[in-house]
C-alpha cells in the first residue's frame, strides 16, 4: 500500500503524473505475459494494473474479454496468476501492483484468504469491479487487515455522498471513470473531470487516476491538466497484444513504442 504513497511523492517532486498500463495476466501465455510486463515497466510505466482472467467480465469491452479468452486458452488459472505476481514483485520491488477483478474470484478463495494471498505475493491494491461502495465493507476490511489498498471507482455522475464515501474508504489511488459503460479505446475519454477532482481533493481522497478510453498522449495530458494524478490505459494496450499475437518480438516493440509517448505526456 505504501508503494503508492512513495510513487506519488516522487512524481510530485519530478512534476510528473503517473502512467499506468493495464493487461490481463497470462495473456497470451505465462511466459510472454511476463515479457510484456517487463517491457511496460522498461518503457516507463509507473505502476501496473493487472487483471486475473475470469469467465464473466461484466465491465470489460470486447478487447479485454478477448484477452481473458486467450489466457484461458493458454490454461492460465488464478493460482498461476499469483505465482506470476510473486515473480513480478521479486523482479520489480518498488513498482505499485494493482489488481482489477471481480467478486467471484475473491469469494472462490474466501475473502480473507484472498487478501492474505495478495499480501504474501506483494500486491498493493485491489479494485473489485462489481462491488459497489455500499456493499464493500467485508472486502475493504479484509484488504486493510492485509495491508492492501481497497480501490474504488468514482463515476462521472458521482454525487456528494458517494464522493465522501470513496474518499473515506479508498486507499492507494481513486479510479476516476472517464465515462459510464464498458472499457474500450474506441470510446475516447470525453469531458474534463475538474469538478470531481476538486471534490475528491477537498475530501482528502486517494490521488485520482483517470481510466476508461485512454488511448493517446493528448488524453493523458488532459487528465493531468484536469487535476488527475495520472492516467490508466487498458484496451489500447491489450489491442496491441492482439494485433501482434503471432509475432512476440514485434509485440514487445509495439508496446514500448506506445508506452513511451504516453509516459512522456505525464511530464509538465
UniProtKB/Swiss-Prot annotation:
Reactions that this protein is recorded to catalyse: (1S,2R)-1-C-(indol-3-yl)glycerol 3-phosphate + L-serine = D-glyceraldehyde 3-phosphate + L-tryptophan + H2O
Active site positions, chain numbering: 49 (proton acceptor), 60 (proton acceptor)
Complex and partners: Tetramer of two alpha and two beta chains.
EC numbers, comma separated: 4.2.1.20
GO cellular component, one term: cytosol
Domain of life: Bacteria
GO molecular function per UniProt: tryptophan synthase activity
Database matches in Pfam families: Trp_syntA
InterPro entries: Aldolase_TIM (IPR013785), RibuloseP-bd_barrel (IPR011060), Trp_synthase_alpha_AS (IPR018204), Trp_synthase_suA (IPR002028)
Family: Belongs to the TrpA family.
HAMAP family from the UniProt entry: Trp_synth_alpha (MF_00131)
Biological role stated in the UniProt entry: The alpha subunit is responsible for the aldol cleavage of indoleglycerol phosphate to indole and glyceraldehyde 3-phosphate.
UniProt KW Manganese keyword: no
Keyword Amino-acid biosynthesis: yes
UniProt keywords, alphabetically: Amino-acid biosynthesis, Aromatic amino acid biosynthesis, Lyase, Tryptophan biosynthesis
Pathway(s) where this gene product acts: Amino-acid biosynthesis; L-tryptophan biosynthesis; L-tryptophan from chorismate: step 5/5
Gene name for this UniProt entry: trpA
Protein name in UniProt: Tryptophan synthase alpha chain
Amino acid at each position: 500500500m505504501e508503494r503508492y504513497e512513495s510513487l506519488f511523492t516522487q512524481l510530485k517532486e519530478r512534476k510528473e503524473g503517473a502512467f499506468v498500463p493495464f493487461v490481463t495476466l497470462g495473456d497470451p501465455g505465462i511466459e510472454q505475459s511476463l515479457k510484456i510486463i517487463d517491457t511496460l515497466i522498461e518503457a516507463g510505466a509507473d505502476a501496473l494494473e493487472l487483471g486475473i482472467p475470469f469467465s464473466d467480465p461484466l465491465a470489460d469491452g470486447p478487447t479485454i474479454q478477448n484477452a481473458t479468452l486467450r489466457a484461458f486458452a493458454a490454461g492460465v488459472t488464478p493460482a498461476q496468476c499469483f505465482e506470476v505476481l510473486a515473480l513480478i514483485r521479486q523482479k520489480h520491488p518498488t513498482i505499485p501492483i494493482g489488481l482489477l477483478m471481480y467478486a467471484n474470484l475473491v469469494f472462490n478463495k474466501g475473502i480473507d484468504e484472498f487478501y492474505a494471498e495478495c499480501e504474501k505475493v506483494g500486491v498493493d491494491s485491489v479494485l473489485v469491479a462489481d462491488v459497489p461502495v455500499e456493499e464493500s465493507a467485508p472486502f475493504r476490511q479484509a484488504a486493510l487487515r492485509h495491508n492492501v489498498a481497497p480501490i474504488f471507482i468514482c463515476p462521472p455522475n458521482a454525487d456528494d455522498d458517494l464522493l465522501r464515501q470513496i474518499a473515506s474508504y479508498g486507499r492507494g489511488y481513486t479510479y476516476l471513470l472517464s465515462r459510464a459503460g464498458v472499457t474500450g479505446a474506441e470510446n475516447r475519454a470525453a469531458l474534463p473531470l475538474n469538478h470531481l477532482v476538486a471534490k475528491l481533493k477537498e475530501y482528502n481522497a486517494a490521488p485520482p487516476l483517470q481510466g476508461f478510453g485512454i488511448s493517446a498522449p493528448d488524453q493523458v495530458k488532459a487528465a493531468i491538466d484536469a487535476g488527475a494524478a495520472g492516467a490508466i490505459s487498458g484496451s489500447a494496450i491489450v489491442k496491441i497484444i492482439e494485433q501482434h499475437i503471432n509475432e512476440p518480438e514485434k509485440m514487445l516493440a509495439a508496446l514500448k513504442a506506445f508506452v513511451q509517448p504516453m509516459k512522456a505526456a505525464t511530464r509538465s
